[in-house]
Amino acid sequence: MKNKIKYILAGCCLMTTFSCSDFLERYPLDKAVNDTYWKTEAQLRAALYPCYEGLQYDLIINLGEACAETVVWGDPTSGLSKVSGGTSSAQDNFPFYNYWRDIYGHIFDCNNFLDNYNAADVPQETKDVYAAEVKVIRALQYFWLTSVWGDVPLIDKVISSEEAYGPRNPKEEVVDWMIEDLKWAAEKLSPEIQTGQDVGRIDRWGALALMARIALQNQRYELAEKVSKYILDNSPYDLYDYEKVYHLEGNSENDPDNKESIIYSLYVKDIR
């Protein structure tokens, strides 16, 4: 009888050990995990949103028109005011530190998507459309980087923190890489302006327009002219009524006939 009790107790201990092990070895429940996440198109679409967040980054404004001599800043001691006035120094140009860090954060989101999207049980053609959108967004991030810093580290996959401090790649190499990515994306994306729930998503012309802009800024004039003319002759885009550009009625969500915005961040009134 005593032996039976010992066996029962030993069995209970083993069961407890296994059940505790199974209970403790769980994937995080408060965030997506690559090993279990990439299954459906709905998950692909959800993973696309962090990538599009990169279009809302203020670099396109603050290091563009906001730093031009036509803009007067209210606070002359602010970092961007000093950049605009030509008085910024290595000690106080914190906006540039933030931009470098944040842009590579957006690039990480894009790389994470591109490293994992093929695992989804979705038709390849559909997956490629999502990947093409992400490649355009990633190219835009590198366009900003090379426009400000020239040579930059070219990171096209998720890397470890130890690998994050590698050497810079020559600007020309990064430009060549961006153009090749955009060529691939243009082949996969729809030639139609996106509408309904897809309004604001990047289409073929967005990829080509960014390619033309990159080519122009990097003295690839023949390519810039060729791509720009192709867009002018074949795309559904056109100039918008100038008066409406600065009113809410000109927002692409409010006026589907606004065919001027090619790549843009859509803000919905009362939401974002």
Range-by-range predicted roles:
Residues 135, 208-215, 227:
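TPR/Sel1-like alpha-solenoid repeat signature
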Residues 41-57, 78-149, 165, 169-173, ...:
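Conserved, well-structured interaction surfaces
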Residues 216-220, 225-272:
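Polar, glycine-rich mid-to-C-terminal structural blocks
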Residues 1-29:
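Bacterial Sec-dependent N-terminal signal peptides
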Residues 29-33, 87-91, 156-163:
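Short linear capping/connector segments at secondary-structure termini
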Residues 27, 146-157, 221-228:
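Short, well-structured active-site flanking segments
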Residues 20-63:
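Membrane-proximal, proline-rich intrinsically disordered regions
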